Amino acid sequence: MVAPATVRGIDQAPTSHPKLLAWVREIAELTTPDRVVWADGSEEEWRRITDELVEAGTLVRLNPEKKRNSFYARTDPTDVARVEERTFICSVDEADAGPTNNWMAPAEMKRTMTELYRGCMRGRTMYVIPFCMGPVEAKNPMFGIEITDSPYVVASMRIMTRMGTKILEAMGDDADFVHALHSIGAPLAPGQQDVSWPCNETKYISHFPETREIWSYGSGYGGNSLLGKKCYSLRIASVMGRDEGWLAEHMLILKITSPEGRAYHIAGAFPSACGKTNLAMLEPTIPGWKVETVGDDIAWMRFGPDGRLYAVNPEYGLFGVAPGTDWKTNANAMRTLDRGNSIFTNVALTDDGDIWWEGMGEPPTHLIDWKGNDWTPQSEHLSSHANSRFCTPITQCPILAEDYYDPNGVPIDAILFGGRRRDTVPLVTEARDWVHGVYLGATLSSETTAAASGAVGVVRRDPMAMLPFIGYNAGDYFRHWIEMGKGTDGDESKLPSVYYVNWFRKDAEGSFLWPGFGENSRVLKWIVERLEGRAEAVETPIGMVPAEDALDVEGLDMTSEDIRIALKVDVNEWQAELPLVTEWFEKFGDKLPGVLWAELDALRARLDAEPQ
């Protein structure tokens, strides 16, 4: 055991916050690092840490003529993604974790992990990262402190969060903060040679909702180690939102302005592989319309003094899936990356010191793949891991809305829920009211691929696209959504309208009916015109869909039959959906709000009343 007084840097804290100082000393005593460094967020610190990571072989400096001030990382092949089976919600009461989360009693988990943490930072530096999710100028800034032994995490957190000395100053001596503890779990004996990506076979990502703590061990991958992201901003924040009357959601936020200059804000929840980042950075194909980005992944929504729901993006960077991001699908993301200051992980490296991944056009004749091996277009495997990532400052996005910086957030006019369904779900459906919208979100689904499941087209529920991220019982989460619909003054007209979209419907030959990408602006146009009371809709058993000719398809290479099928509500397909929803709802027992059962019964009755 190393007494904390002997750990270099332990007594050089740039703060007098007593609870923070006590916690740092406690963790230093437990983990026994060689030294403690308080991350200040400066350019000099970025240079020092990236230089050290390059020297250690963890990072490769990219060609500055291609990607200025940018780096490439290659992880251990076993440490490439979030590990949901090792992710726990350690609520005091097991029932509060619910059927969608892994649970362990908090005392048992802390005993287990305390032994893993004991001496786990030996031979390494312990970094203390003060950070804030969302603007520091907010009425109630959302502070966090991450303790980590990974310099890769320090560099990435500088991109993804507002962090450093300015956060410590804003915290003063008494601000509350989320305690976020992370270790890669790879202590070094004296003289032991380090590896380029240290990690541990044993992994835990544990959340303690009542005490607002996160303990992560064994993984250096971003989703498991950048604890401000999913761990704080969704799992812990969703519990805070439940307790305090707001929502923490897995949603993009965009601003759309019509040719007449009227601006609206839309939030959208989409499961993975459904184009959330692409929609957030949309380039409209219809003349006169403009889209700006507020956020691509997380939205915190609170009621404003006017009774409307306002959203902020708590993140400072983009942590996007690389494959499939290209000039055709998301030119604004590519422009953001071209401005440099980024970290790329598990993509491929070109011979001239740039990065490449599948989807970026013709592959070069030679690459070094994500495992460090030679790769050519004749290779039988992909050059980049399917979950390879870019980490880049959102402030470099060329269409970032000025509203992004507003600590009060932006007023949300519409909420989208979207999944990947080859049939059944129309291109766009408008909910009848807020509770019907919650039903649509609670039953949100996507189809798995053959690679993921061994069977194409298996429908999996992903409520509000939050399945891996709800920090408490999902039945209570649905109830919280319903309660939020009562607003602050009972005026439902101030609530966002809710829509369910599906860009992925296919025809009988298996081809996508809708072109997607920039053409999705046509669906957003119809939604805006619905908000303004100008677009026609048709009543169906599942909600309102665009009337014939209400959707602007001018210039699209689509037949009227294609459009009809894309918007079709097939009674037989929807009746086949009912037992799947029933099975899903039964998971939650008496925690499921009765109004959602009532919505299902009403849908069944409307379908039964339709002519076959």
Swiss-Prot record:
Its main location: cytoplasm. The keyword Nucleotide-binding applies. Its cofactor is Mn(2+). The active site is at C274. GO terms for biological process: cellular response to glucose stimulus; gluconeogenesis; glycerol biosynthetic process from pyruvate; oxaloacetate metabolic process; propionate catabolic process; response to lipid; response to starvation. Its EC number is 4.1.1.32. GO terms for molecular function: GTP binding; manganese ion binding; phosphoenolpyruvate carboxykinase (GTP) activity. It catalyses: oxaloacetate + GTP = phosphoenolpyruvate + GDP + CO2. GO terms for cellular component: cytosol. GTP binds at A273, C274, G275, K276, T277, N278, R389, R420, F517, G518, E519, N520. PROSITE patterns: PEPCK_GTP (PS00505). Pfam families: PEPCK_GTP (PF00821), PEPCK_N (PF17297). The keyword Chloroplast does not apply. CDD domains: PEPCK_GTP. Pathway: Carbohydrate biosynthesis; gluconeogenesis. Substrate binds at R82, Y221, G222, G223, S272, N387, S388, R389. It is found in: Cytoplasm. Mn(2+) binds at K230, H250, D297. It is an enzyme of class 4 (lyase). Binds 1 Mn(2+) ion per subunit. NCBIfam families: PRK04210.1. Catalyzes the conversion of oxaloacetate (OAA) to phosphoenolpyruvate (PEP), the rate-limiting step in the metabolic pathway that produces glucose from lactate and other precursors derived from the citric acid cycle. This is Phosphoenolpyruvate carboxykinase [GTP]. The gene is pckG.
